[in-house]
């Protein structure tokens, strides 16, 4: 489903400095309905990999394929088709402070031109999935960190994507809320979504027992079917 083929990403130097190698000659595949962890220390290249898949960054070398299509050859006018198939969750939530939980989730469908009936039905469904039905009309400032992240996950789910990309989604959370978010990602995976989770949290890595791709200085140093935290 997803294939990185000999990908390198090198950023040009600032002033008289050296170029920054974010990713170097990385190749791997992610199968449909797989749950994969991309792990490594800060600066290892995890976020860059996700940005390359979303076509937010262009590789210096190599190709990234999604369902057989080179994502960097998609015309800008057709990017929305790729983005509809991929839901994204970030560490900093990226919620609109002036919108309620319901409105933050509904916004995605409004942009897609969905009817009010569709929006109401789908938002109610995802609120139930993430356990926030009773917080539908609260604003972000009235929610805990764990609740805000669940809103972000609900928003990522609203258009029923095939793939969920989660970039350090528990980085700002306490251990209790961290486990809550991980259980939710596992639930989404059970529904049939492919999940790619970028993290450096050793507890998450060890608890899940899923495939682990370990990055170090932009290179893959391990790719294990049931990996554990090893740095």
Residue ranges and their predicted role:
Residues 62-70, 82:
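Conserved ABC transporter NBD signature motif
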């Amino acid at each position: 489903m997803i294939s990185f083929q000999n990908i390198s990403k090198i950023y040009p130097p600032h002033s008289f400095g050296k170029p920054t190698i974010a990713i170097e000659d990385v190749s791997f595949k992610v199968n449909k309905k797989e749950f994969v962890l991309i792990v490594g220390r800060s600066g290892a290249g995890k976020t860059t990999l996700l940005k390359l898949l979303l076509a937010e960054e262009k590789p210096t070398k190599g190709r990234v394929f999604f369902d057989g299509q080179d994502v960097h050859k998609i015309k800008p006018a057709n990017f929305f088709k790729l983005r509809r198939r991929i839901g994204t969750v970030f560490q900093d939530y990226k919620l609109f402070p002036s919108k309620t939980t319901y409105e933050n989730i509904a916004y995605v469908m409004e942009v897609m031109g969905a009817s009010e009936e569709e929006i109401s039905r789908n938002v109610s469904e995802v609120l139930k999935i993430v356990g926030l039905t009773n917080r539908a009309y609260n604003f972000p400032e009235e929610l805990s960190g764990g609740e805000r992240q669940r809103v972000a996950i609900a928003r990522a789910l609203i258009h029923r994507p095939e793939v969920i990309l989660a970039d350090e989604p528990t980085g700002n959370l306490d251990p209790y809320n961290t486990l809550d978010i991980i259980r939710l990602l596992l639930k989404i995976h059970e529904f049939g979504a492919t999940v790619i989770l970028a993290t450096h949290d050793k507890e998450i890595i060890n608890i899940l027992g899923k495939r682990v791709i370990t990055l170090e200085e932009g290179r893959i140093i391990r790719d294990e079917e049931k990996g554990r935290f090893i740095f």
